[in-house]
Amino acid sequence: MSGPAAWPWPAASSIQGMMTAMFDIVEKQKIDPAQVKTLRIALSQPVFDLHGNFSRYKAKFEALLSAHYVATAILHDRELTLAQFEPARYDDPKLRRFAERVEVRAEPSLRGVAALVDVETIGGDEFSARCDQPLGAPENKLSRAQIEAKFRTYAAGRLSQQHIEDVIGAVVRLEHQASVRTLMDMLRATPQSAAGAPAPIAARARG
């Protein structure tokens, strides 16, 4: 890869290729995780050394590094956000058991962050995907729609839905703005409380 990357998912950069391959499968196929017989992942040797030995991850940090858990979360949830790295999710006994079954190996023919993913169901269906350039890399850039979707996901706890759309609109019109200060002021707006109203200053300080 060359140039800066804008990764779509909150996990280690070196397994973004694996994540891209996983999403390539789950977004095209309706796979019931309970019907999966085997989930096999092949990584380059350096990436395997970093991420291929966390089938029994201990906590959030190891979950973020674990090819086993990340693939498991994508298969089960069909998404990967910070929610998948909360204890309530990565400590789910069902996900932990499945992660231990995921087969991760080093493949000598793979280089860098390239990855191969193979899924076989109990019924005999097989699905495969290969990724050489992960989504978000300069060679496989996120689309505007994907960037906007990521912003909507992570801004939801801070800004109202209308405010989020206003920010996106301001970015689209940025080159026509008299000053970037307008956008900066919008991004510094009062965060949302759990009930959807602006959170008090004291509450934000405690958070």
Where are these regions (language model features)?
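Terminal-appendage/accessory-domain detector
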Residues: 1-207
